[in-house]
């Protein structure tokens, strides 16, 4: 095991030594302007970084530098989405924290008033290979995807990328992600921590990480999810009790009786967006043909009410139109190998791949290690997500047995309660009121306030 780790570090070192540090390579990745983009004052870069030469594995990135007057003083923030198999460009960049939003036609971009690039230089990475524009020349690689290889190749990417962008070496660096990135983020942070301990003067100045609605611990995630369904009146008492009777949440695999109980309970939900249980789900025009006039009218009324608050449940569809446009791909230096499939928000080759090689049951041992290492760690949870709900996260965090520094209190976003928070020794937990699975998408102002407090290392405001 030690020899394997040493060989990996030597490979990373070789990658660093052979990567070009020339301005030319960086300039080749510069985006002059994206199709339909409003005029902006910040720089953008995108392109590929090879993470495995022999197999032809390359990861695609998009850097949007800070819009502040002094981007060179702002930290670098890497954003990762989960799945596994979902694109950080589709979700993180285009729906959540990036500087642009995509119009309904997929033709134009408009500014996100709550973009996180006011506070940091944002690096979006499509990982692992097979996600978005990231690719491999070896088809069998899809059968070898897993947590360990993803973490290793994300580290290789970062070191090689920093040789292309040397101005970000030693810059304060943070990793943020959501959902299954609850695995990716702490696992990458652990790899960086190990790498930094192995070398003098390491180039990645990791300060901390933050995860939202994260997968943390399989047993507690399962129990917390069922509890949320029942406590939020999504399932009946009978369904809840049937699940408790037939399901062993500590088992590696559920029994047939448990699967059946969960299947029956899911029918209690109705046709809702499970990632945001109180907002309307996306209903594309072609799906409205079987609706009555009254149903169509009510759908339009409900959607209009939420759109006035800048919420649109169909934004994922607009991204798939925009990023498949040839002129957009040319502007982003993407798909230069003519990948034989369309760009999608979530990749079938990864998302539907039952051959995902390894997925740790619990991230809690990594949390304990990195808390002891002194990293800044925040965990936040949108309280209307039923897929990885706040109850699951609270159960998981409870297993860490951390000492409470600042007891539970409401924090404010403007003149409204933004959520609640509790501060522990080595970790801060935050709920975001009225937010679903993608917190910055549903509550952009609150999410930006959350980011500012995280980067500053300050507790969230108790008053407005």
Swiss-Prot record:
Organism the protein comes from: Arabidopsis thaliana
Gene designation per UniProt: SCPL22
An example of a GO molecular function for this protein is: serine-type carboxypeptidase activity
Q: Which residues form the active site?
A: 179, 385, 437
Asked whether the UniProt record includes Disulfide bond among its keywords, one would answer: yes
Tissue/organ expression: Expression not detected.
Disulphide bonds annotated for this chain are: 86-346, 247-258, 282-314
Question: What glycosylation sites does the entry record?
Answer: 52, 113, 137, 290, 335
Q: Which domain of life is it from?
A: Eukaryota
Q: What's one GO BP annotation on this UniProt entry?
A: proteolysis
Purpose of the protein: Probable carboxypeptidase.
Please tell me where this protein is predominantly located: secreted
For the keyword ATP-binding, the answer is: no
The signal sequence is: 1-22
Q: How is this protein named in the record?
A: Serine carboxypeptidase-like 22
User: What subcellular locations does the record give?
Assistant: Secreted
Q: Which Pfam families match?
A: Peptidase_S10
* Gene3D superfamilies noted in UniProt: 3.40.50.11320, 6.10.250.940, alpha/beta hydrolase (3.40.50.1820)
Keywords attached to this entry: Carboxypeptidase, Disulfide bond, Glycoprotein, Hydrolase, Protease, Secreted, Signal
Spell out the family assignment given in the record's similarity comment: Belongs to the peptidase S10 family.
Tell me which SUPFAM superfamilies the record gives: alpha/beta-Hydrolases
Q: Which GO terms describe its cellular component?
A: extracellular region
Matches recorded under PROSITE patterns: CARBOXYPEPT_SER_HIS, CARBOXYPEPT_SER_SER
Q: What is its EC number?
A: 3.4.16.-
């Amino acid at each position: 095991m030690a020899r394997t780790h040493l060989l990996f570090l030597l490979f990373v070192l070789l990658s660093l030594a052979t990567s070009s540090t020339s301005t030319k390579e960086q300039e080749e990745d510069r985006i002059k302007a994206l199709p339909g983009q409003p005029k902006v004052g910040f720089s953008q870069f995108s392109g590929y970084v090879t993470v495995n030469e022999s197999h032809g594995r390359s990861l695609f990135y998009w850097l949007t530098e800070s819009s502040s007057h002094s981007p060179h003083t702002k930290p670098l923030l890497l954003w990762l989405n989960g799945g596994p198999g979902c694109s950080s460009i589709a979700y993180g960049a285009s729906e959540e924290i990036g500087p642009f939003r995509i119009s309904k036609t997929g033709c134009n971009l408009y500014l996100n008033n709550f973009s996180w690039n006011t506070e940091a230089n944002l690096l979006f990475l499509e990982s692992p290979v097979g996600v978005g524009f990231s690719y491999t020349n070896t088809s069998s690689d899809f059968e070898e995807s897993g947590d360990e290889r993803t973490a290793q190749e994300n580290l290789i990417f970062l070191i090689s990328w920093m040789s292309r962008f040397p101005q970000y070496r030693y810059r304060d660096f943070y990793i943020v992600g959501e959902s299954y990135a609850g695995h990716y983020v702490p696992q990458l942070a652990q790899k960086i921590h190990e790498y930094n301990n192995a070398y003098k003067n390491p180039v990645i100045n990791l300060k901390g990480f933050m995860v939202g609605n994260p997968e943390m611990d399989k047993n507690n995630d399962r129990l917390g999810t069922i509890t949320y369904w029942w406590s939020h009146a999504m399932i009946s008492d009978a369904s809840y009790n049937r699940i408790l009777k037939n399901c062993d949440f500590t088992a590696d695999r559920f029994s047939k009786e448990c699967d059946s109980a969960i299947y029956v309970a899911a029918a209690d939900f109705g046709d809702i967006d499970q990632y945001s249980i109180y907002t309307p789900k996306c209903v594309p025009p072609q799906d409205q043909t079987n609706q009555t006039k009254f149903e169509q009218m009510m759908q339009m009324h409900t959607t209009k009410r939420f759109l006035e608050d800048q919420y649109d449940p169909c934004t994922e569809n607009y991204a798939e139109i925009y990023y498949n446009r040839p002129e957009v791909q040319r502007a982003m230096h993407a798909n230069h190998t003519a990948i034989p499939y369309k760009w999608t928000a979530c990749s079938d080759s990864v998302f539907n791949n039952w051959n995902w090689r390894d997925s740790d049951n619990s991230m809690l041992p990594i949390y304990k290690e990195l808390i002891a290492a002194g990293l800044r760690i925040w965990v936040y949870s949108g309280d209307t997500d039923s897929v990885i709900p706040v109850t699951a996260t609270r159960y998981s965090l409870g297993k860490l047995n951390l000492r409470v520094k600042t007891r539970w209190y409401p924090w404010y976003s403007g003149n409204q309660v933004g959520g609640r928070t509790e501060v522990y020794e080595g970790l801060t937990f935050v709920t975001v009121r009225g937010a679903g699975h993608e917190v910055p998408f549903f509550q952009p102002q609150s999410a930006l306030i959350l980011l500012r407090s995280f980067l500053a290392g300050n507790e969230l405001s108790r008053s407005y």
